[in-house]
C-alpha cells in the first residue's frame, strides 16, 4: 500500500532516535554481558507484553471486547497491566480523536502515534508505554522527543496546534505513572528533535 511506499522512503521517528542515541552502546554492552539468547528472550518478552497491552487498549477505546492475551504467564501479566492502564490512565483522556494515527512529514520522517486525544482540556499526543520498572523521567528523553515529533508532523499535516505530549506508563509491579510534557518543555524537546533529525539526515542519505 501507499503507507509502505512512504515508509520505505522515509525513516521512522524511532529509527532516527535509535541512530542518534547514546543508549546504543549501553544496549550492546548489556547484550555482550548476558549473551544473545538471553538478550533476545528478554527483548521478545518485553515486545510481546507491549504488543498485547497496546492491542488491548486500542480494543477498549474502540469498544471491542475481545480477549487477545496469550494463555501463559506473559499474557496474564499483560492482562493485569492493561487493566491498570484502563483503570488509571484512560480516565485522564476526556476525548479520543484517533488511534494508531499514521503520520508522514514530507520525506523527513514518519511514525504512528498510539492515540491523539484530549488530556486536561488540551489536544495531546498520547503514547502508552510498558516497562519492567517505572522509568525515571531523565531516562526517557526519547519518548518525549518521539511525542514532539508526532505533534509536529500532525500539526503540519492537519493544521492543528498540538503542544502537549503524554506518556502513560505501567510497569510489571502494576505501578502507573503519567509524564506530561507541555509549554517550555514541549518547545525544548521539539527543538532537540529538529536538531537530531537534521543531524540524522546529514549523516545518512535517505
Question: Where do the language-model regions lie?
Answer:
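Residues that form generic nucleotide/phosphate-binding pockets
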Residues: 16-19, 33, 56, 60, ...
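Mg2+/Mn2+-dependent nuclease catalytic core
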Residues: 97-203
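A non-catalytic, helix-rich entry segment at domain boundaries
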Residues: 35-99
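Short, flexible loop/turn segments with low-complexity composition
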Residues: 72, 205-206
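Short alpha-helix boundary/capping segments
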Residues: 7-10, 45, 138-142
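Short alpha-helical hairpin
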Residues: 8-36
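Short, small-residue-biased leader/transition segments that mark boundaries at the very start
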Residues: 2-6
